């Protein structure tokens, strides 16, 4: 199995409901190590840059507005097949379709405010990690 890194965001809705600790617990219980983490409030420019691939989609404006509506937590997770592992922990994008016991099933209210974001592939994880973290901010855990 491959040790990978993936990128994760705890979105404004989950931060506002004080679910940060519970979500971090899900990551760690699943064997993922948090090797970088910070809380920030995205500017409009940061949100537009991060979600640039969706700029022509009809939901782009609402997405940017939501992602700038309050603080978020961004983190880098490391572990065996981290991208897939995190996607399984998150559950389906639409919480109504998410399996019981997943983050979105337990903490999200709607497809628009669905608690978390996670990279969909190793390549996107690398790009997303670099958007928010310098190499010096990553703290590989050997113990």
UniProtKB/Swiss-Prot annotation:
One of its GO terms (molecular function) is ATP binding. Its EC number is 2.7.4.6. ATP binds at residues 11, 59, 87, 93, 104, 114. InterPro entries: NDK-like_dom, NDK-like_dom_sf, Nucleoside_diP_kinase, Nucleoside_diP_kinase_AS. It catalyses: a 2'-deoxyribonucleoside 5'-diphosphate + ATP = a 2'-deoxyribonucleoside 5'-triphosphate + ADP; a ribonucleoside 5'-diphosphate + ATP = a ribonucleoside 5'-triphosphate + ADP. The active site is at 117 (pros-phosphohistidine intermediate). This is Nucleoside diphosphate kinase. The lineage of its organism: Bacteria, Pseudomonadati, Pseudomonadota, Gammaproteobacteria, Alteromonadales. Major role in the synthesis of nucleoside triphosphates other than ATP. The ATP gamma phosphate is transferred to the NDP beta phosphate via a ping-pong mechanism, using a phosphorylated active-site intermediate. The keyword Nucleotide-binding applies. It comes from Shewanella sediminis (strain HAW-EB3). Belongs to the NDK family. Keywords: ATP-binding, Cytoplasm, Kinase, Magnesium, Metal-binding, Nucleotide metabolism, Nucleotide-binding, Phosphoprotein, Transferase. Homotetramer. GO terms for cellular component: cytoplasm. Its main location: cytoplasm. It is found in: Cytoplasm.
């Amino acid at each position: 199995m491959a040790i990978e890194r993936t990128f994760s965001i705890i979105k404004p809705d989950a931060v506002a409901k004080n679910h940060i600790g519970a979500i971090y617990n899900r990551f760690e219980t699943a064997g993922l190590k948090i090797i970088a983490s910070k809380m920030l409030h995205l500017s409009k420019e940061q949100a537009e840059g991060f979600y640039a691939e969706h700029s022509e989609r009809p939901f782009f404006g609402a997405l940017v507005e939501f992602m700038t509506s309050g603080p978020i937590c961004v983190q880098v997770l490391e572990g065996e097949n981290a991208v897939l592992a995190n996607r399984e922990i998150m559950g389906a994008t639409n919480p109504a379709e998410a399996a019981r016991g997943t983050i979105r099933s337990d903490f999200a209210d709607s497809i628009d405010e669905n608690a978390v974001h996670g990279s969909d592939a190793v390549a996107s994880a690398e790009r997303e990690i670099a958007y928010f973290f310098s190499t010096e901010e990553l703290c590989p855990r050997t113990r």
